[in-house]
Each structure stands twice: as C-alpha cells, then as structure tokens.
Amino acid sequence: KPVGLVGDLAPVEAAFALKELIEGQGGSVECRTDGAHLPAGNRSGYVGTASIADIDSAGAIMLIGCNPALEAPVLNARIRGAWSRGAKVGVVGEAVDLTYEYFHLGSDRAALDKLVAGDNSDALSRETLVILGQGAIREADGAAVLAKAMAFADHTESKFLVLHSAASRVGAMDVGAVTEGGLAAAMEGADVVYNLGADEIEIGDGAFVIYQGSHGDRGAHRADVILPGAAYTEENGLFVNTEGRPQLALRAGFAPGEAKENWAILRALSGELEAKLPYDSLAQLRQALVKAGPHLA
C-alpha cells in the first residue's frame, strides 16, 4: 500500500494534494511524524481554545511539557510581558531558564496528576491560560496527558493552547492528513512511501521511498527517487499557526534548477498515474481546499 508522510514545512496546499493523491490510490497519509498523540477531527484538542493574544491578559499561565524560550521565543516574550504585569506562571515539566520566575510543580506524570486533582482555587480566581507542548504528548501515554491537561483547563474554566513545533502540523490536520492509529498504523504494510519533506523520521528497509523536498537531509538519503520541490521561501503557500489562524507565505525567491512548486509536482504525478487531481492552478487548488475546510479561506 502507498503511504504519504507530511514533513514539518509543507504548505497546506501540498498536504491536501498529497492526501487526495495517496488516498485515491488506496493508501493513507500521516502528518504526526514525531508520534504526537493529537486527536484527529477535534480541533479544540490539537489547536485549543485560546489565541496568542490571550497571553497578554492572563492572570495565570500554566506551562505543561514545553520550553517556550526554545520552542517559541516570541511567544515566550509575551509570557514574560504578562509575568511583568503580575501574572503567575507555573511549570509542569523540565525546570529550565525561561527568563522569568515561575513555580515548578514537578517534571513527571505524577506532578500533572497532582495538578489536576489538587486545589485549583488560585487558577479559578484568575484569568488562566494552559499551554501544552509537544514534548508532553509524544510518549506512549501522550493521549492521556492531553486529556488531563484539557480536563484541568475545563475544570478551572481556563483557556487552552497547544504549542506546535512544526509549521505544517495544524494545517495538515485541518485537511485530514492523518491516519487512525497514528504513524505506526500508517506505516504498517507500506510498500511505497511518498515522503513530502519529512526528515525527522527513520524509514526502515523494504519500502520504495519517493522523497519530495528541498534539502539533502535524512529523507533524501533514504530515497529511491528524489523529486526536487521548492522550499517554503520559494513558493506561495498557506500555513496555519499554533492558534489555528491561516497565514499566507509569499515567495521570496525562485526555486533553483529543476525544482517545482510542491503542489504542482503532485498534480503532474497524478496525471501520470491516470488519477488526475481536479485542479490545474494554485487558485483552483485553493478553491477545493476552502470547500473542504471553509475556515482556511
């Protein structure tokens, strides 16, 4: 069976085209290549209910399994701004230098359990924001950790935000580039792997690998066939940020050599497979994309 993998920097248009191409051939597509236990079809679970601007008015901020100073420095600066205005910051996870003071509640699952089961009167008395990082949900019990974080946010009537570290992740999940059971289920029995710029994953022997991307990274070294695609700076593309807001990236320069726009490579390949995708331009693709996900308009 064919399997499509969506890398961290793929625009929504390419993820959507890959999904339609691979699923049209009876295969499956997966964007959670780091193993994150994010729930397909539940946007409040993989994006949250908060906006980044909510940080500015928060009276308390709870960080679970994330290091915003490293993962999102600009967002961390906003947290520091809220702290400087009197917001309390709590951390469940590794104790690191966040450039502001915080209450460290522990670094293991027991600390999270204690947080969820404990006295939350302080959180209830403040405008509280819960921020959950990817590090908390990549382990085998990631789904349970996510559920506990959401339960804490619900009990304390807090706003909830998932901090993503992959630019393509939210948009790819919005268009359904996921497989029930995650990466392991998608890769089971795969004989052809179409790798759309996923360089953080080890693909085992046996499968025929097609790599479409812009850099000679791990994915390209494992490939049997390489299709040079444009980098995110070399094509117009849609991305959805960590708060679920669609954003348009504009081309800064043209792709070198024979490299093409990523959606166009997939469209051309679909013609060779006699399974032509129903769009001949980026505008037509976006029309189909918005029809599938109106909030991406």
Task: Identify the role of each PLM range.
Residues L5-A15, L70:
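Cofactor-cradling patches in redox/metallo enzymes
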Residues P2-G7, L129-I131:
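Short glycine-rich phosphate-binding loop at a beta-alpha junction
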Residues K19:
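Phosphodiester-processing cores and adjacent nucleic acid-binding clamps
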Residues Q25, V29, T33-L296:
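Non-catalytic alpha/beta scaffold blocks inside enzyme catalytic domains
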